[in-house]
Amino acid sequence: MAKTKAEHVHEVFESISDNYDKMNGVISFQMHIGWRNDTMKHMAVKPGSKALDVCCGTADWTIALAEAVGESGEVKGLDFSQNMLKVGEKKVQPYPQIELIHGNAMELPFPDDTFDYVTIGFGLRNVPDYLQVLKEMHRVVKPGGMVVCLETSQSEIPGYRQLFRFYFKYIMPIFGKIFAKSYKEYSWLQESANDFPGMKKLAALFEQAGLEKVTYKAYSGGAAAMHIGFKKIR
């Protein structure tokens, strides 16, 4: 019987967890760090806030959020891969304000209106239903709170999109084989990036999820993009 997307994604991330951080740097040529830093500048996270990092993986963005909210704040990181969380647990030890949770982005285990900020970084493309996850993020963020996605995107620059797809389809899996001995897993990850909607379509999904004042910004010619939306104040 064919595996569901969720089952396949789970197997992929359980398999690549030990080399995930190293491969992120290799694949993006370290640009993902700058993308995240710029996104954090746009967020302007306030000390003492409560934040949730969905599909937190090995907790890089979770840690950035913890540094922004400070010890008086609170950060939850949620992921469905136990192996990714094991790597993350070692990294978050210096941050008592962080709690990592094993859970499903499609059904977030939190009450409505809980967090000031809800983020998802390079995880939305891997979920079974983009809109359902965005709706869940909208549900758990407080009125006036911010939902943020940093993800691969589809460039609108002529020729660049083709170059980007060539890199993801042919070069990235080779890097996966060389540096992580995971050609098959990184071949699948390029498919998820290729299938992911462009900036305008993702902005429309943000609005369908109930978010307002939706804005987005392209990085590196559209190789990635940041989207920000707010929950309406009742």
UniProtKB/Swiss-Prot annotation:
The keyword rRNA-binding does not apply. InterPro entries: SAM-dependent_MTases_sf, UbiE/COQ5_MeTrFase, UbiE/COQ5_MeTrFase_CS. Pathway: Quinol/quinone metabolism; menaquinone biosynthesis; menaquinol from 1,4-dihydroxy-2-naphthoate: step 2/2. It is an enzyme of class 2 (transferase). S-adenosyl-L-methionine binds at residues 58, 79, 104-105. Its EC number is 2.1.1.163. GO terms for biological process: menaquinone biosynthetic process; methylation. It catalyses: a 2-demethylmenaquinol + S-adenosyl-L-methionine = a menaquinol + S-adenosyl-L-homocysteine + H(+). Keywords: Menaquinone biosynthesis, Methyltransferase, S-adenosyl-L-methionine, Transferase. It comes from the Bacteria. Belongs to the class I-like SAM-binding methyltransferase superfamily. MenG/UbiE family. NCBIfam families: MenG_MenH_UbiE, PRK00216.1-4, PRK00216.1-5. This is Demethylmenaquinone methyltransferase. It comes from Lysinibacillus sphaericus (strain C3-41). The lineage of its organism: Bacteria, Bacillati, Bacillota, Bacilli, Bacillales. The gene is menG.
